[in-house]
Amino acid sequence: MDTLKDQFVVPGDVIGKIGDLKVRIGPGLLQTKDTVLATKAGVLRYSKFHRFYWIENEQKRYVPQVEDMVIGTIIEKHAESFKVDIGSSCSALLSAYSFEGATKSNKPLLNVGNLIYCRVTVANRDMEPEVVCLSQKQKAEGFGQLIGGYMLNCSLGLSHYLLSEDCFLLQILGKHIPYEIAVGVNGRVWINSGSNHNTIVVSNTIYNSQYIQDDQIEPFILKSLSINETSGLVEQN
C-alpha cells in the first residue's frame, strides 16, 4: 500500500493488498477481497495518525451513490414530497411516504430548514437523486428529522473515517461526554449533547482531529472541558 503513497493514480489502478494490515480505506478506493483498487483519479493519501487511506482530488462537491447515508436540509416543501439539499450538484427528492408509518393522513411534519438523516436510493447522472428516511428493512433505525443540535461541515474523507466501526476519535469522546451523532458521507456531521458547551467541545474535537495525532485527542478534550466559557462554535471556510 505504501509504494503508491503520494502518487497520482487513476481508476482501475491496483493500490495494494490489505492482507492482515489494520487500515481503513475512504473515498476513491474500493476493496475487492484483499485487493484495493482506485475508483477515481487523484493522489493517494495516508494518515498515519488514523491509519486511513483515501484518494485526494479536486472534487469539492459530494457525488451521490446508492446506499449512502447523508444529512440533508429541506429546501422545498410540497404536498407529497420534499426537495432536499444533500450537497450535490442537484437537490434530492424525498417522498412524504418514505418514513416509517407514513400514510396520507400521517405525513411527517417537516419544514424548510429542517435537517434530516436519510439514505440515497437513486443516484443516476440522468435523474435527480432520491432519498428515503428508512433503512433497508423499511424501519426508521435512526433515519428521520434531526432535532436540535449543531451541524458541522467537514471533508469527505473525515466523514468516512467517522463512520468506520472502530473510530478511535468517537470512542475517546464517548468516555468523557454523552452525545448523539449522525454522520453523512456528504461531509456533514450532526452533533447533540446535554449542553451547548459540550456540543462545542465535540464539534471542535472532530474538526481539529484532522490536524492532531491520536494521542493528543484526549488531552485536547480534557482541556476543552475545563474551559467554562467559550466564544462560539468552530469557524468553517
UniProtKB/Swiss-Prot annotation:
Q: Name one GO molecular function term.
A: RNA binding
Residue span(s) of domain S1 motif: 67-137
User: Cytoplasm: present as a keyword of the record?
Assistant: yes
Segments crossing the lipid bilayer: none
GO biological process: what's one of them?
Answer: poly(A)-dependent snoRNA 3'-end processing
* Keywords (A to Z) from UniProt: Cytoplasm, Exosome, Nucleus, Phosphoprotein, RNA-binding, rRNA processing
Please tell me whether the keyword Cell division is annotated for this protein.
no
Gene3D superfamilies noted in UniProt: 2.40.50.100, K Homology domain, type 1, Nucleic acid-binding proteins
The record's section on InterPro entries has: Exosome_RNA_bind1/RRP40/RRP4, KH_dom_type_1, KH_dom_type_1_sf, NA-bd_OB-fold, RRP40_KH-I, Rrp40_N_euk, Rrp40_S1
Subcellular locations according to the entry: Cytoplasm; Nucleus, Nucleolus; Nucleus
User: Would you say which domain of life the source belongs to?
Assistant: Eukaryota
Q: Give an example GO cellular component term for this record.
A: nuclear exosome (RNase complex)
SUPFAM superfamilies per the record? Answer: Eukaryotic type KH-domain (KH-domain type I), Nucleic acid-binding proteins, Ribosomal L27 protein-like
Q: Which PANTHER family does the UniProt entry name for this protein?
A: EXOSOME COMPLEX COMPONENT RRP40 (PTHR21321:SF1), PNAS-3 RELATED (PTHR21321)
Its biological function?
A: Non-catalytic component of the RNA exosome complex which has 3'->5' exoribonuclease activity and participates in a multitude of cellular RNA processing and degradation events.
Oligomeric state and interaction partners are given as:
Component of the RNA exosome complex.
Describe the family membership recorded for this protein in Swiss-Prot or TrEMBL. Answer: Belongs to the RRP40 family.
Q: What is this protein called?
A: Putative exosome complex component rrp40
> What organism is listed for this UniProt entry?
Dictyostelium discoideum
Q: What is the lineage of its organism?
A: Eukaryota, Amoebozoa, Evosea, Eumycetozoa, Dictyostelia
